[in-house]
Amino acid sequence: MRTSQYLLATQKETPADAVVISHQLMLRAGMIRKLASGLYTWLPMGLRVMRKVEAVVREEMNAAGALEVLMPSIQPAELWQESGRWEQYGPELLRLKDRHQRDFCVGPTHEEVITDLARNELSSYKQLPLNLYQIQTKFRDEIRPRFGLMRGREFIMKDAYSFHADQASLQETYDRMHQAYSNVFTRLGLDFRPVQADTGSIGGSYSHEFHVLAESGEDDVIFSDSSDYAANIEKAEAIPRETVRPAPTEELRLVDTPNAKTIAQLVENHGLPIEKTVKTLIVRGAEEGKLIALIVRGDHELNEIKATKLEQVADPLVMATEAELRDAIGAGAGSLGPLNLPLEIIIDRSVALMSDFGIGANIDDKHYFGVNWERDLPVPQVADLRNVVEGDPSPDGQGTLVIKRGIEVGHIFQLGTKYSEALKCQVLGENGKPVVLSMGCYGIGVSRVVAAAIEQSYDDKGIIWNDALAPFQIALVPLRYETDVVREATDKLYAELTAAGYEVLLDDRDKKTSPGIKFADMELIGIPHRIVVSDRGLAEGNLEYKHRTEQDAQALPLNEVLTFLQARVRR
């Protein structure tokens, strides 16, 4: 491809509304253009990258035994009402009416549509398992679209759905898709982690997220430094570093603390180490009118997902109001503790191993110091209540936990029978009786992968693509292309490279465009291999080669170009 025949839409300045680096660089490199809030047009340069992602995804889905379909993006309300999600989904679901005043939505996901297809097409266990996928435009009406393609309203997604007669079959396909996802992100050259995850609003019983590691990521990714253990922050099990509770060394004492409404103030004003403090959080219980006390160490954070999985706690988690605290305990939020507390108490594992610690006295402006379990109060129910912190022991017993930021690019679920039961999707089983199908759901954010790859690999000059993702593999930049000797050598080399199967962008802009601008544009776009053709180099029988990640260029004999590139360019 020649730049004279291409839409080369690079920009020197960074748009003011672009915050994250992927958004900035995709605009500046001429990959996308904003149409409206959360809506983007893909220009040729960006579309080439996304098509490469799609190609790898298709190959791995096909290899895993999935069959490609294409479902409508507009979905009838009746299906969503049948599943119960028409009202549950909330304002992110873009609802509309046709000219006959019938209700539809723009699909944010396709569980209902695929389940409707399956219940109409499948009748026997002999047709199972069945795994169907599509690459389709989705729409979620985000309240505040931001970060370009990282959190837009319209996006491209690969979603697959599998149907099974039993759990064993679902597990087999789930494992195969897990491997297929790992294959996809490995082939795309990304540094990623598959992590155990909570199933969230999609539902189901078991799931994994796939995260590209990047400092700009919105999620915490937890993994062991010595094993394959990995989980997201909601799912990661918190194991105490301590194994034994120390013996008491202090006497219990009641202390006036008028200036200690928070843990930070308690530490600062009374010299108590933060790891010797606790937070007593009062939440509403699952039983109407009941309050539950959840206690974590002062330097730890309550994990709301873990808390709501306790049978005593209401879901979603709701903190007690100040009025409720006064009515039930007689003290405000800054002075609460487990001693003489007239509520059911659940403490975190780390709290159960504390000694000589400080707690609120359930009297305004007073705390107990030197508190010890079993001596001063009984050990209540113990549970995993907190977020893990870096350095915690790995739950599998191997190594310690590391925390990195990650961008979620894939998510796989074992849905079970949630949708098949709601939509009555069943077949005749081997015994001739109806069997409600078990389902799996598997998503990859195709357009998000492009942005995530940039967040992981860039410098002050622009994007750094690897060979698998680059819009072009080679940038061919002639100096003084208007001269016969340079033009003839460049055109000959361009023909040889394209005939050999390389994707080449020939920068044939005229002499009004300086070499510096050409080099800067190719680096901004992120093309991994650059070859410069100059009359001086040709006189010596050489070209100039430079990799995008290298500082210095090197002389490359003209007659060794193809051999050299064969060893350097991943194809």
Curated annotation (Swiss-Prot):
Keywords: Aminoacyl-tRNA synthetase, ATP-binding, Cytoplasm, Ligase, Nucleotide-binding, Protein biosynthesis. It is found in: Cytoplasm. One of its GO terms (biological process) is prolyl-tRNA aminoacylation. It is an enzyme of class 6 (ligase). InterPro entries: aa-tRNA-synt_IIb (IPR002314), aa-tRNA-synth_II (IPR006195), aa-tRNA-synth_II/BPL/LPL (IPR045864), Anticodon-bd (IPR004154), Anticodon-bd_dom_sf (IPR036621), Pro-tRNA-ligase_IIa (IPR002316), Pro-tRNA-synth_IIa_bac-type (IPR004500), Pro-tRNA-Synthase_IIa_type1 (IPR023717). The keyword Protein biosynthesis applies. GO terms for molecular function: aminoacyl-tRNA deacylase activity; ATP binding; proline-tRNA ligase activity. Homodimer. Catalyzes the attachment of proline to tRNA(Pro) in a two-step reaction: proline is first activated by ATP to form Pro-AMP and then transferred to the acceptor end of tRNA(Pro). As ProRS can inadvertently accommodate and process non-cognate amino acids such as alanine and cysteine, to avoid such errors it has two additional distinct editing activities against alanine. One activity is designated as 'pretransfer' editing and involves the tRNA(Pro)-independent hydrolysis of activated Ala-AMP. Consists of three domains: the N-terminal catalytic domain, the editing domain and the C-terminal anticodon-binding domain. HAMAP family: Pro_tRNA_synth_type1. Belongs to the class-II aminoacyl-tRNA synthetase family. ProS type 1 subfamily. This is Proline--tRNA ligase. It comes from Pseudomonas putida (strain ATCC 47054 / DSM 6125 / CFBP 8728 / NCIMB 11950 / KT2440). The lineage of its organism: Bacteria, Pseudomonadati, Pseudomonadota, Gammaproteobacteria, Pseudomonadales. The gene is proS.
